[in-house]
């Protein structure tokens, strides 16, 4: 992840190169090509939003997209330190490329009959969720609308995922925020630069994330921050949390799990499977009995 300013500090740029992260998500969830693009865009967006909206160095933002399309809902979590994770409801859902231009039909698989919701922590530690109705279904335009409508942040958002040979070759995102004092001339130059960039994935392939940011801020005196953060797939699940999740089941249900030789718990975020032994499940009952004594 790279951050910077341009035009004398009146533009703020945040970028993420997430090719390895999205490939890891594709592999873990066995995602179809179009589902990979939809989730990858959402994951990149979550990291960018964490930087723009977060108040701490370890702030997290969760983005949920539910447009009623074949892929079902999409959920992604990103943090300011580059940790990302995410999943979709129907990982195998896919659509043929669009007939008009041959590109992946992300809008079709996501749908537009629903909303994009963003959850973050306020200064007091309480979670806050804002949302907008989906209009594009392409993710980037909807994230941009969210920032403008719910957060009153003038912005431009670019997101992209490109697969080659069944693997993610390029994935990432770029968010540009207009700060107080920005001039119409600067905005016009920025708009022209973005229009000339073409596909973000082409920029990432040819010049990397730095090249993409330089292209977006061409002629606007880009100044990069020195606190670059590598992006990586990271899930907070653990065996201990898997065991704790069984506390929501009654004693009879847990006894059935013990009688059947244990229980498998699946983490939806990363598809990690935990096979819990009868002894681990029985220990829950013993712990509850001691607590009640």
Swiss-Prot record:
Classification via InterPro entries: Heat_shock_Hsp33 (IPR000397), Heat_shock_Hsp33_C (IPR016154), Heat_shock_Hsp33_N (IPR016153)
Molecular function (Gene Ontology), one example: protein folding chaperone
Family matches, as Pfam families: HSP33
Record-annotated disulphide pairs: 235-237, 267-270
UniProt keyword annotations, A-Z: Chaperone, Cytoplasm, Disulfide bond, Redox-active center, Zinc
UniProt record, GO biological process: protein refolding
Location in the cell: Cytoplasm
PTM comment: Under oxidizing conditions two disulfide bonds are formed involving the reactive cysteines. Under reducing conditions zinc is bound to the reactive cysteines and the protein is inactive.
The encoding gene: hslO
GO cellular component: cytoplasm
General function of this protein: Redox regulated molecular chaperone. Protects both thermally unfolding and oxidatively damaged proteins from irreversible aggregation. Plays an important role in the bacterial defense system toward oxidative stress.
Keyword set includes Disulfide bond: yes
Major location category of this protein: cytoplasm
SUPFAM superfamilies per UniProt: Hsp33 domain, HSP33 redox switch-like
Organism: Deinococcus radiodurans (strain ATCC 13939 / DSM 20539 / JCM 16871 / CCUG 27074 / LMG 4051 / NBRC 15346 / NCIMB 9279 / VKM B-1422 / R1)
Chaperone is among the record's keywords: yes
Membership in a protein family: Belongs to the HSP33 family.
Gene3D superfamilies referenced in this protein's UniProt entry, alphabetically: Hsp33 domain, HSP33 redox switch-like
Name of the protein in its database record: 33 kDa chaperonin
């Amino acid at each position: 992840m790279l951050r910077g300013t341009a035009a004398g500090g009146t533009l703020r740029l945040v970028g993420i190169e997430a090719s390895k992260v999205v490939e890891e998500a594709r592999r873990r969830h066995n995602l179809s090509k179009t589902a990979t693009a939809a989730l990858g865009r959402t994951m990149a967006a979550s990291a960018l939003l964490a930087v723009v909206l977060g108040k701490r160095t370890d702030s997290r933002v969760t983005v949920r997209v539910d447009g009623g399309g074949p892929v079902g809902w999409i959920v992604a979590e990103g943090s300011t330190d580059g940790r990302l994770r995410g999943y979709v409801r129907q990982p195998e859902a896919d659509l043929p490329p669009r007939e008009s231009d041959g590109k992946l039909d992300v809008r079709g698989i996501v749908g537009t009959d629903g909303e994009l919701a963003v959850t973050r922590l306020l200064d007091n530690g309480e979670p806050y969720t804002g949302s907008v109705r989906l209009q594009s279904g392409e993710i980037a335009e909807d994230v941009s609308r969210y920032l403008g409508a719910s957060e009153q942040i003038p912005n431009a958002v670019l997101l992209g995922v490109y697969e080659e040979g069944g693997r993610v070759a390029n994935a990432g995102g770029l968010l540009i925020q207009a700060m107080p004092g920005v001039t119409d001339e600067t905005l016009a130059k920025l708009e022209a630069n973005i229009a000339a960039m073409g596909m973000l994935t082409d920029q990432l392939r040819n010049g990397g994330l730095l090249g993409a940011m330089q292209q977006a801020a061409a002629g606007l005196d880009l100044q990069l921050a020195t606190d670059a953060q590598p992006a990586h797939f990271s899930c907070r699940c653990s065996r201990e949390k898997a065991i704790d999740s069984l506390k929501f089941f009654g004693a009879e249900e847990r006894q059935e799990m013990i009688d059947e030789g244990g229980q498998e718990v699946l983490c939806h975020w990363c598809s990690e499977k935990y096979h819990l032994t009868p002894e681990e499940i029985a220990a829950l009952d013993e712990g509850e009995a001691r607590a009640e004594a």
